[in-house]
Amino acid sequence: MSGKPKRLMVMAGGTGGHVFPGLAVAHHLMAQGWQVRWLGTADRMEADLVPKHGIEIDFIRISGLRGKGLKAQLSAPLRIWHAVRQAKAIMRNYQPDVVLGMGGYVSGPGGLAAWLCGIPVVLHEQNGIAGLTNRWLARIAKTVLQAFPGAFPNAEVVGNPVRTDVLALPLPAERLIGREGPIRVLVIGGSQGARVLNQTVPEVAARLGDKITLWHQVGKGALENVLRDYERVGQTQHKVAEFIDDMAAAYAWADVVVCRSGALTVSEIAAAGLPAIFVPFQHKDRQQYWNARPLEEAGAAKIIEQPQFNADVVAELLAGWDRPTLLAMAEKARAVAIPDATERVAAELVRVAK
């Protein structure tokens, strides 16, 4: 790249679903010579995670408004105004060529500050239903991108940027053909676990016995109780962990996944090429349900709403899927994936920054 390097500011925070896709795009552009800084909040996961990836981070003070009491609601305009002022000072100091909003509380004041400073804003919506912040910012953004169809009526569908180690996995036909033995079931409820999965899956193991083998991520603080449940039903042979560090290895091992349907999880499962049983978290706007719908419609997954999620239903479903069926579902999942999502988002940032 000739001349002065282009500068990107990424606005993302709160959860891995916002932060990890932002990191994927940041690393891609850094490899092309771009300078990248991050806008976040000091009390959320980005504060520790982003610097570990070699990216400097600036902080503003902002928190969510949903579900807060009357006093917090009344003080919200003042808090937002202060956050916008902080973000404007950061933008003027760094002078980015373009700002990427990936969602989270920080994107609202950050996006407004960028717009007030005349800096173009590119939004990326990870979920099938747009979040409140992105719905508002879409009015002032230069470009709106979406991972799944339907979040915004006219936005380009580019997928979710996912980790390179997941994209590097062998295709389903290479990975799954020739496998024998029990069906390998990977159970993941996110880094915090999911109580309904932890309570139900040991009972599924009891019903299916040696027809399946499990690798179960239970989440922080749940390991002892879940191990006790497996012991109670005589199923101590399964691999149970508080947290799985190498998700690519877990996806490579699995024949099928049982999990929540957060945006990043759904996108990783599609990129890996895996069948899934999705149990959407019960959001008011059914965000996780709509994330999972494209894979269910493609014949690659089954959605079980939480009130209907029980050991009998799951055991019957898994027992009905033989290896040829699982391979066909895996290939359908991979066909839905958008493996070049990172490149698509980066290309739009390059275009807007010219």
Curated annotation (Swiss-Prot):
Catalytic activity, EC: 2.4.1.227
Membrane topology: Peripheral membrane protein
Catalytic activity: di-trans,octa-cis-undecaprenyl diphospho-N-acetyl-alpha-D-muramoyl-L-alanyl-D-glutamyl-meso-2,6-diaminopimeloyl-D-alanyl-D-alanine + UDP-N-acetyl-alpha-D-glucosamine = di-trans,octa-cis-undecaprenyl diphospho-[N-acetyl-alpha-D-glucosaminyl-(1->4)]-N-acetyl-alpha-D-muramoyl-L-alanyl-D-glutamyl-meso-2,6-diaminopimeloyl-D-alanyl-D-alanine + UDP + H(+)
UniProt keyword annotations, A-Z: Cell cycle, Cell division, Cell inner membrane, Cell membrane, Cell shape, Cell wall biogenesis/degradation, Glycosyltransferase, Membrane, Peptidoglycan synthesis, Transferase
Pathway entry: Cell wall biogenesis; peptidoglycan biosynthesis
Protein's GO biological process: carbohydrate metabolic process; cell division; cell wall organization; lipid glycosylation; peptidoglycan biosynthetic process; regulation of cell shape
Domain of life: Bacteria
Subcellular location: Cell inner membrane
GO molecular function, one term: UDP-N-acetyl-D-glucosamine:N-acetylmuramoyl-L-alanyl-D-glutamyl-meso-2,6-diaminopimelyl-D-alanyl-D-alanine-diphosphoundecaprenol 4-beta-N-acetylglucosaminlytransferase activity
Main location: membrane
Pfam family of the protein (one): Glyco_transf_28
Residues the record lists as binding UDP-N-acetyl-alpha-D-glucosamine: 15-17, 127, 163, 191, 244, 263-268, 288
GO cellular component, as recorded: plasma membrane
EC class: transferase
Function: Cell wall formation. Catalyzes the transfer of a GlcNAc subunit on undecaprenyl-pyrophosphoryl-MurNAc-pentapeptide (lipid intermediate I) to form undecaprenyl-pyrophosphoryl-MurNAc-(pentapeptide)GlcNAc (lipid intermediate II).
UniProt xrefs under HAMAP family: MurG (MF_00033)
Family according to the record: Belongs to the glycosyltransferase 28 family. MurG subfamily.
Protein's name in the database: UDP-N-acetylglucosamine--N-acetylmuramyl-(pentapeptide) pyrophosphoryl-undecaprenol N-acetylglucosamine transferase
Taxonomic source organism: Serratia proteamaculans (strain 568)
This protein's encoding gene: murG
